[in-house]
Amino acid sequence: MKKLTNVFWGSGFLVLLAVLFGAFLPEQFETFTNHIQKFLTSNFGWYYLIVVAIIIIFCLFLVLSPIGSIRLGKPGEEPGYSNKSWFAMLFSAGMGIGLVFWGAAEPLSHYAVQAPGGEVGTQAAMKDALRYSFFHWGISAWSIYAIVALALAYFKFRKNAPGLISATLYPILGKHAKGPIGQLIDIIAVFATVIGVATTLGLGAQQINGGLTYLFGVPNNFTVQFTIIVIVTILFMLSAMSGLDKGIQLLSNVNIYVAGVLLVLTLILGPTLFIMNNFTNSFGDYLQNIIQMSFQTAPDAPDARKWIDSWTIFYWAWWLSWSPFVGIFIARISRGRTIRQFLLGVIVLPALVSVFWFAVFGGSAIFVEQHGNSGLSSLATEQVLFGVFNEFPGGMMLSIVAMILIAVFFITSADSATFVLGMQTTGGSLNPPNSVKVTWGLLQAGIASVLLYAGGLTALQNASIIAAFPFSIVIILMIVSLFVSLTREQEKLGLYVRPKKSQRSQL
């Protein structure tokens, strides 16, 4: 068995501390973490916006630069997974259950509850609702994941470094990357991963329970949610023990097929013309305003500033907190692709799918609110999707497909997380032992269950977002480190705007 590292014990201690606070002092812990989170979003919102903008610009630079032809692996090495399986796995890990949870609920909230641009229920509010949903789940989120994944994949497969966050900083930290500073960085990454995934497990259990309640009258309580977590835990641990090539790959492919079926059925059975017209209009609006939205802080408009802090800054912090987990997993499955192929595959295609997903489900929710069930916006977040389906022909069938999708996404996210946590706490092993994966799987399930029971899930989510602040500094250092190493290799390989044939063969 691989030896457990100081990162395991250090991160385990922090997680235990957070869980104990959440379990025994849930209200105080929520107040404490909420205060810190609001302080960070209110005072450092500008910082989060600039960090994400830097990430996007750097990714664009790499795609357009000759550096983009460098391969993440040995010269001429082929990818280990087909394009379909690669996309399925990275997409399932990166968004997963969040798309189902927020696909209808977020645009509806922007339209009917709190519009980003002013008065709710207006045509302008509808356009803004979709535009901002595209913005929150589009290229910005995927660029954050991509840059962390790229740094890890490059240093692991090109430089043969350990698969650890700290190992990506060796060019600028030197020996300190292997010492206490490097271990602290890895501990923050593991803490953010454990807390973020445990929160998602809790939210997933709530959404499945909410769907069962809405559809079949099943009680909405902790007993049902705990039963859901137990069943899902057994399934994802069986998948985790079967290995990456069997369990996660198979489940991810199933995810994509089921998600595709649900998307197409909703588009056909729902208000198709309304969806496509508003998708086209709002997508153009998104492209036209993406730069302005990326830097908007609204310093002279208190209401708009509050909305930006609550949504955009919250999302940027959330994606940053999830980037260690998703980045490590994407890096693990991306060997053999060029930097350009990697970035286009991780950013552009997932962003387009996410955008269209919100157009279909968010557009459907807004249509129902306008023309059918005007009380849709008063439903709990986890029930909005099922409320939308209830207004469509074949609504029960759609709801059942959605429940299956939530469950499979649920299993895949937890499965991927146990794999990543196993890697991070065994020195970056690409194939961590089952015993370590099972340990992390049980811990995640236990954390989610305890905090669902105690009511401390929101506080745990706040803690994860707080961890995003120090990790954002790590990401900036990763960009600098990656740039330093790539420019050195560019000079070594003689890469220019038009490399010669002989030079391409060296990549």
UniProtKB/Swiss-Prot annotation:
Signal peptide: none annotated. Induction: Constitutively expressed. Up-regulated in response to salt stress and cold shock. Pfam families: BCCT. It is found in: Cell membrane. GO terms for cellular component: plasma membrane. The keyword Signal does not apply. InterPro entries: BCCT_CS, BCCT_transptr. The chain crosses the membrane at residues 7-27, 44-64, 85-105, 134-154, 184-204, 224-244, 256-276, 311-331, 342-362, 392-412, 440-460, 464-484. Keywords: Amino-acid transport, Cell membrane, Membrane, Stress response, Transmembrane, Transmembrane helix, Transport. It is a multi-pass membrane protein. GO terms for biological process: amino acid transport; glycine betaine transport; response to cold; response to osmotic stress. Activated rapidly in response to an osmotic upshift. Disruption phenotype: Mutants show a strong decrease in the rate of glycine betaine uptake. Mutation does not significantly affect cryoprotection or virulence of the organism, probably due to the presence of other glycine betaine/carnitine transporters in the cell. It comes from the Bacteria. One of its GO terms (molecular function) is amino-acid betaine transmembrane transporter activity. Activation of preexisting BetL protein in response to relatively low salt concentrations represents the most immediate response of the cell to increased salinity. GbuABC system is most important during prolonged exposure. High-affinity uptake of glycine betaine, driven by a sodium-motive force. Involved, with GbuABC and OpuC, in osmoprotection and cryoprotection of Listeria. Does not mediate either carnitine or choline uptake. Belongs to the BCCT transporter (TC 2.A.15) family. This is Glycine betaine transporter BetL. It comes from Listeria monocytogenes. The gene is betL.
